[in-house]
Amino acid sequence: MKHYSVLKNEMIQALDCLKEDSILIDCTLGFGGHTIGALQAYPNIEVYAFDKDIYALNLAKERLKPYLQNIHFCHNAFSQFLDIVPNVVLPRVRGIIADIGVSSMQLDETQRGFSFVSSTLDMRMDTRADLNATKVINTYSPIRLEEIFRIYGEVRQSKKLAEIIAYERKKKPFSSCLELSTLIEQHFPRVGGIHPATLAFQALRIEVNDELGELKRLLHNIELAFDEGKIASCRVGIISFHSLEDRIIKQCFKQWSKSCICAEESLRCECGNNHAKGQILTKKPIIPTPQEIAQNKRSRSAKLRIFELKSSKDKGV
């Protein structure tokens, strides 16, 4: 199985803060590419590897057999890391990485209900979850569908798409991605080489897996762990694939870097001007090289942002 870990070298370079007894939290293990790269570069670290997708987790376990003594596999949502990683080892966490979004193997596996030609309409990364794409498409109101397509997919004709789906499902409920993608292709023209169902499928996947909510909870829990002193100095590197995710990460990192947290209308600082949690290490996001994009076209929209959390001790305060 061919697999490409997006921005792998750039992510590993960002982890040069790892020491011999450090812990790395890989929030999105996938096929294990970033974890393998980290363990090859820093062989004595310990990794807590998260993935909601049991299929991906089992494949990764096979691929990571040479490193099993260094890895704790966690079949959990990455936002739950504070409940899974023992408090006693949290101070050793020096890196937290995430590669947000669907993997190539999920897209290419037609039985998972992610691809345009899938015979199912599922899109769950965690098959234990109740909500799937079939329920969204066949039971959500046209108004709610329009919101999902417009907000999560930034679909230009979101209202038209929602109305077409609502009309067609009265005749026969949708049961496969192929049916849905074919319908979209019939009513909406291709733009360049991009399939007209791409953004609609993105929106459905985000809704089914609560992807933006998961990302926000992850960032909140990282901040919480840092503020409570459970995590000290640590690098946070997150790869995103569309503007909604990137905006959340960018705004969060910007907030973390602020020394002054007074209201904007304040005439002078009254907060002490010492609230920065660290510094942004990527003024502009790191993007794939032309060579990487040529090798893996799905990497073309990837952006990596890195933040360095610094405890008062490491700041010299």
From Swiss-Prot:
It is an enzyme of class 2 (transferase). One of its GO terms (molecular function) is rRNA (cytosine-N4-)-methyltransferase activity. It holds the Pfam family Methyltransf_5. Keywords: Cytoplasm, Methyltransferase, rRNA processing, S-adenosyl-L-methionine, Transferase. GO terms for cellular component: cytoplasm. S-adenosyl-L-methionine binds at residues 32-34, 51, 78, 99, 106. Transmembrane segments: none annotated. It comes from the Bacteria. The keyword S-adenosyl-L-methionine applies. It catalyses: cytidine(1402) in 16S rRNA + S-adenosyl-L-methionine = N(4)-methylcytidine(1402) in 16S rRNA + S-adenosyl-L-homocysteine + H(+). GO terms for biological process: rRNA base methylation. Specifically methylates the N4 position of cytidine in position 1402 (C1402) of 16S rRNA. Belongs to the methyltransferase superfamily. RsmH family. This is Ribosomal RNA small subunit methyltransferase H. It comes from Helicobacter hepaticus (strain ATCC 51449 / 3B1). The gene is rsmH.
